[in-house]
């Protein structure tokens, strides 16, 4: 009976359980379950929870859903899904509580989870130089956040490297790879604001929006004025800015200056150190950039201080060596004499330094007998070798010169008295310190210390409006009209501006002031503008600006920023301020703004032809063709090389100078852009889970995005259920993932289409000055010369059709690179557009890209290992092509400079024979024009174009007062002539006359008037007066090693000129032969002199006087002369 009752109880319990489960199952049949997705992306695991999507509806959940919908409505305008709408009034929304009573709350009262990170679960996802990207979790909802402040994030996970504060210096992104190495000052997270399917909600500081996050390289932004240094202090400049905070730094291209930006407010002074004056550093301040010109501070200071005195300048410039020589002389005589005189009074000093150097002294004394050069009596070094006694160093008495009979240091006797003492004993110390060798060394150390003290005391060197009418304004960043500039945007309009068809009415709230004026708005602006501020913006700034104001608000207006250095329009200024706010609206607009450079920092250190270091060569014509002298010239195709040729016709009295200078040589590549690749910094995901159904059921709530989608089914079965879910082999989890790319480390991939050897060649002298680009494909030709390239080396590691990578350091890399739309595991994934949008990726994630896990009790989880293709790690296998950075032109070509010879440059010069003849009459010069453009008292000089018409062919010298010229001789042909000439003037040559002297004859001179001179201030921030710059150039030319080498070879120019291209080789051979010849004759003379001294011939000279003649005979040089047979006669008695 008991068994039957027990069975009955079990059946009833089972039926009750089944009934209860059926009711619950029916209630939850279409409900989704909680699930959690975990993204693992390198060192940045990301966890996202969808519990807000799947929880059982309660009053709290309904309220939270209403809040999220309100935030979404603030961001998205339902009627125009591609834009954002700013509310003019405070919006209110109804929220239903459990009692179904309506409650009204303000949008400003809604909680901002990103600002409450300190009290919520949060995790740092990435730290840049100027902001931080993090995520917070509240009520199982994950919020993505970007903030310019680190406040309240100290307790977040991965906050170990979080700085206490971020710099507030305004910056904007750099999108052009070529500019990154020049202007990069760190990185910053930006939001690319869009409403496409690949975006997601994100909050920047306290402003919610929709878009994608990317890490970008940034540069400084802002209004900054750089004041040139004055003559009194030529290495200090001052910078000023009207903005509240501005940043500056001195940067060498390619240098990492991520945390070296210096902020200032108002003004600041910068003093350049000698390292900054190498010509490679740039001063960056806001939008402004300035190249610090190459200046030898030591030389220039001496040139200025001792102007016009070459000897004082030389002494001053070489003072660093002269001061060492002076110290050496002081040590050798006065200091040594002083030390020798004070040895006894300073015995404590010698004991002290002896104690300090005792191990060294002990070692030297013990090893002295093994030294190759020893003194026989003093214990000092001796150059002349001779036998030395072993007892020489054991002078134990300071005052005595006597030596000890036995030297304990060198003694081999075992029973010596000193052997019973240790090396560290006082007996051994006194013995070692008092030896002559040790005492001489201690005195030498004392002399050196005194010399160093004196050396340290010696000097190192000798030497647009937005105003309604009067008092009502619109200020960017504030949605209300104001009456003046403000620190904080007011809560409502402070004035009113009514724009009518024929007039404008302005009124100030709180006063009775009403002003009327004519309608002078921008014409042809057709757009709707209802509020007062919209009318003002449409009137003064136009409809395009009004569209930006409505749909793309400024969170920080930067009211003091004008963008005057970049010449920004009102639209461009607004977009630049949006970039300062961390928002990217359009890649093309951003690329345009960030590519604007104010200043000369990108200018290369291009100087005039360095004639002082170029070799000189006399050149005689090879043949006469059609009445013209033909000169054949061959040069090595090497950048920086060249020759100064002196042209002759064997009869001409004056040689004509002709200079060829190869400025640069390299290879010009034509390329086709493929894609951009960048590392994945972090990952964002979104998904939806269901308790029953399959992927199709899940996709009804989480639609396919088109790429990087995933779906897992089934996710509900025995042992893998969550609370209130009893489905078996049902359910699905679907979603998508999006990567956050580090565009700071992006590479652009190109395909090589064509390569050509190119040389930039400058020609100066008799033909005037001009620079031309010569290629190997088509020979260059003009009226007087032809040039052609014969290439020896063309294969430099890059082949046609090969893929190359342009890195963030502006270098070119080659290697295994994936082609576009090729999923091969080589460097080149992810494949993106320039603005970081994927163009080739996985459409659906595979099983290897993620893993799924669950538990009997708890939430399901998905671990995504890789969101799309990622092979950026293979960049280590790429090979850098050249150490010289390159710059791309319109993403279609670049020039790769080479530092070695690529072949030969052959030039044929045809000069009319009349150039070498005296003009038969005064030439007629008509239609003259001389126009100049440049600067005075500067290194660049005035670039002038001289044009005229001549009736004769002749050679002429040219000159002009107060100016030096790049060339002083021109070849004038019959007909039209045009020359490029550079003039360096100390005064404005406007309306002055340039004089032409045909064949140097002043009797038939011709004058040409300077028509126009446009003087432009150079960008150089260090003024270099032309007078001192000329002296410096002259000094460098006179003291140049190349100039000296060319000078000592110059006597052989005439002979070597007959050997053509072997000119310089023959000069060196002749110089070496001459040196050997001089050495040979000097050796003979030395032998004669030695014999003369050795035989003492000078003692054998005698003065012979004949009896009958008072003439002095030549002295006899014989050593063994005969003696007189009789004594000399005495004539004293005749007196």
UniProtKB/Swiss-Prot annotation:
The keyword Nucleotide-binding does not apply. A motif (Cell attachment site) lies at residues 41-43. Keywords: Disulfide bond, Fusion of virus membrane with host endosomal membrane, Fusion of virus membrane with host membrane, Glycoprotein, Host endoplasmic reticulum, Host Golgi apparatus, Host membrane, Host-virus interaction, Membrane, Signal, Transmembrane, Transmembrane helix, Viral attachment to host cell, Viral penetration into host cytoplasm, Virion, Virus entry into host cell. The chain crosses the membrane at residues 315-366, 1068-1088. Residues 36-314, 485-1067 are lumenal. Residues 367-484, 1089-1135 are cytoplasmic. Tospoviruses are transmitted from plant to plant by thrips as the insect vector. Belongs to the tospovirus envelope glycoprotein family. This is Envelopment polyprotein. It comes from Tomato spotted wilt virus (strain Regular2A). The gene is GP.
